[in-house]
Amino acid sequence: MLRLTQHASLGDRRIVGDMSIRLFYDQWAQYNLRMVEVIGAMSDEHLTVRPAAGRWPIWATVGHTAGARVYWLCAVLGEPGVEDTPFTDPSGAGWEDDLNTPRGADQLVAALQTTWGVVDGCLDRWTPEMLTDTFTREYGDVRRIHTRGSVLQRLFSHDAYHCGELSQTLGVLGLPQIDLWRSD
C-alpha cells in the first residue's frame, strides 16, 4: 500500500511503502526497443562500419552495450538471468573483446532483448529503498563500492551514450538513426 506523506521539517512530499522503481525508468524499455528496431534492420556490411580508425565497429558497440547490462547487474550485483543471455562469462569479457568474430543483426537483437530481460526484472523487483544497497566490485587490484542506484544510473546513461554514438555513425552513412523519443 502506498501513501503520500508530508515531511514536516522539509515540507516535501514522499511516497512511503513498497513500490518498484519502474515508474522512474518508464522510458527505458522504449529506448531498448528503438535500438532493437534500428539494429535489427541493418545489413552485415553496415554493422561492420567503424566510425573512425581505432574505434569499434557498430556490431561491437551494440554487443558492448548489451553485455554491460549483464556484467553490472549479474556479475557485480548478483541479479539472476545471466543464463538467459549470450554473456555467461563472469569475467566481463564481451563480444567487443573478440573483433575477429563479427556479430549479425539477429545475434545483436537477441543480446539486446535478453539483457533487457535482466534490466526489466530489476525494475520490477527493486524498490526505491534498495537503491542505496552497496556492493563491492573488485577488478584486478582495484576495489570499488557501488550502490544499486549508481549502477542503474550508469547503465541507463551508458545505453543512451552508445545510442547517441551509434546514431551519429548511422547518420553519416545515411541510415535511419535511433530515435529514442519517438512516441508511436
Q: Which residue stretches match the model-derived regions?
A:
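Short, Lys/Arg-enriched N-terminal segments with co-localized hydrophobic residues
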Residues: 9-18
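Short, contiguous alpha-helical
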Residues: 5, 11, 25-39, 45-94, ...
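Acidic/histidine-rich alpha-helical segments that form the ligand environment
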Residues: 94-136, 150-158
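N-terminal leader segment of winged-helix/HTH proteins
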Residues: 20-22
